[in-house]
Amino acid sequence: MLKKFIILLLLPVITFASTDKYIIDKSHFAIGFLVEHVGYAKTLGMFREIDGNYSHDTENNTINDNNIIIKTDSVFTNHDKRDEHLMSPDFLNVSKYPEMTFRANNIKIDNEETIIDGQLTLLGITKPLTLYGKINKIAKYPFGGIIKPYVMGISAKGVIKRSDHGMMYAVKDNLVGDEIELIIEFEAIRQ
């Protein structure tokens, strides 16, 4: 009877031991983008506010229950007037759509490349988005106090067409490129 009781006590530990919850570290992330400007050069920008979390199944090496939220009014291109224009209804329309979200449906992880298939919701329109990247490292963080958390580092890239989300400003004349290159770098802390 005692043996059965001990097994029942350990069952939740055994069941949940292989899944780790992670929260994106807001001080170690970058979501950047590149967009063509009149064919001369690409403009580099980024979003400075993000929230996100996910679960990592260590036994099967899969990522689940993910949710990434990007604050659209955090757009930054190092040019105040351009940033104001990007926040206007011509582009991000931040007063109506204060957030864009990404949720992965399928994540294939191997040693060489991680492929993340998901759904990006931008301007209220949800479209598929595939990101290509890799998990750089999962280990105890080398800095900090006595308790050093486990951290996962991820790099990823992808491309979206802004017209797919109804963002049509200057697409027709190719003054602002339709394709947006995404560059994502972040660390997430195991909870």
Feature annotation, model-predicted:
Residues 17-191:
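Low-complexity, acidic/polar, glycine-enriched regions of mature
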